């Protein structure tokens, strides 16, 4: 049996488990989490209660959803030092690039902007050529190819995994929905009775 949670739903599920009723999870062979940062403490609690392998997945809709993975159990989980599990390693046919403001690769451990490459990238945003042009850009390392600017800030870890550090813009998520604060600001300011 396999199941897939967003981390907040996994947290609610784990909160309902006790050592006695956790036996209901014994048939789980794999558990996947995606959609939000996956807290390290939650993974450790899950592992202690169930022993079912937990995998962290990462990826935006603009790139066929899941573009990286990280095993959130066993020795890999034990080695995690941060508050959330790394977003991990690229899946097949996917590239992860972490670049500085000059579009140069950053060294291990240095924060930069996360870009995605590969055949799974969307063509762009329907009816939004301006947004498409700003997010889907030419890949300076692969002539004729494109890459997607995620807006996520990340860094390379010593083991080659990628760690998510936050956002470089004012986007946030509420209940899994992307909220662009700049769009709300512009819409409010366009109203006749609103001033800043």
Region locations from a protein language model:
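Alpha-helix capping/helix-boundary segments
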Residues: 9-10, 38, 121
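AMP-dependent adenylate-forming
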Residues: 52-56, 71-196
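Conserved catalytic/ATP-binding subdomain
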Residues: 8, 63, 177-179
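The DHp (HisKA) dimerization/phosphotransfer helix of two-component histidine kinases
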Residues: 9-12, 134
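Active-site phosphate/pyrophosphate- and oxyanion-stabilizing loops and adjacent acidic/basic residues
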Residues: 11, 44, 186
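Conserved glycosyltransferase catalytic-site signature
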Residues: 6-7, 184
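Gly/Ser/Thr-rich phosphate-binding loop
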Residues: 2-4, 14-86, 95, 105
């Amino acid at each position: 049996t396999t199941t897939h949670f967003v981390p907040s739903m996994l947290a609610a599920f784990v909160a309902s488990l006790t050592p006695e009723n956790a036996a209901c999870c014994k048939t789980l062979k794999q558990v996947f989490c995606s959609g939000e940062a996956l807290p390290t403490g939650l993974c450790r609690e899950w592992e202690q209660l169930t022993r079912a392998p937990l995998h962290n997945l990462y990826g935006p809709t603009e790139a066929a959803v899941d573009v990286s993975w990280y095993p959130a159990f066993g020795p890999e989980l034990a080695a995690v030092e941060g508050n959330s599990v790394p977003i991990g390693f690229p899946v097949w046919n996917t590239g992860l690039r972490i670049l500085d403001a000059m579009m140069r690769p950053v060294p291990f451990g240095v924060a930069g902007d996360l870009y995605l490459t590969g055949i799974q990238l969307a063509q762009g945003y329907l009816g939004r050529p301006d947004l498409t042009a700003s997010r889907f850009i030419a890949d300076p390392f692969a002539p004729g190819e494109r890459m997607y600017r995620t807006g996520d800030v990340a860094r390379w870890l010593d083991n080659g995994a990628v760690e998510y550090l936050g956002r470089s813009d004012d986007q946030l998520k509420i209940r899994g929905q992307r909220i662009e604060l700049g769009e709300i600001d512009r819409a409010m300011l366009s109203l006749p009775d609103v001033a800043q």
